[in-house]
Amino acid sequence: GDNYFNLVPKSMPGLQWWGDICVRTDIENIKKIDTKSGKESILVTLEEVNEALKNGKMPYKLTGHIKPLRTLMAASLPWGDRNVITFTQYDDRPPGQKYMIWYDFSKKKIVNLFNLQGEGPTNFDFCKENGCMAYTIGNDLYVAHEGDFSSMVNPKVTGNQQQEKDVVYGQAVHRNEFGIMKGTFWSPKGTYLAFYRMDQSMVTDYPQVNTTARIAELVPDKYPMAGMTSHKVTVGIYNVKDGKTIYLQAGDPTDRYFT
């Protein structure tokens, strides 16, 4: 009846956990929520972040200038023991370089940033021992060093282009079975980065469909059906210092699963 909408639970966008503390991000603020009383208090404001981006001292010399943020909705607080929010933003160089940026709201300054190559970076894996960030774009794996430099871990294709397009680096393998939820693993001292290399060239395409487009689009996916040929996975070791990669000699990868 007329009272229906008063009884419907209201959603609260932007909720996340900062350690054991519940926080909420919105356009202009990030707020801490008292879980007993529901009272909110401001942790950081958009104005403070943009002031640090515009006039604050950057930890590294950059080629361009970071653009101001329009919202804090996409910011995150990944570490419960640190007063740091992370977000991505572009600089003012056409077509725009994308950065992963860390802002310390207790010090009110930018404390770290990474230049991310290309569009759609994901699978971020930070190593506090060496200050590097591993991430993927498409099928490729990168390591971003602090400041204005990133290096590709997997070598650029020089041989079979068709085969290499079906090889995935640095992502979860085996369809996320066996508890595999990521594809990069830093060594204890940050000297090396272990990563999965998944060759899917022998796997048949499964006709997935993207229904979010105006007209549905075919987006084939490499999906090993039961009883059919599966992909082959090997483990690479990337040396951060010299940029060289070796692969573990673990025998024939056919129907083997590394966890």
Q: Which functions belong to the PLM regions below?
A:
Residues 1-259:
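Beta-propeller folds
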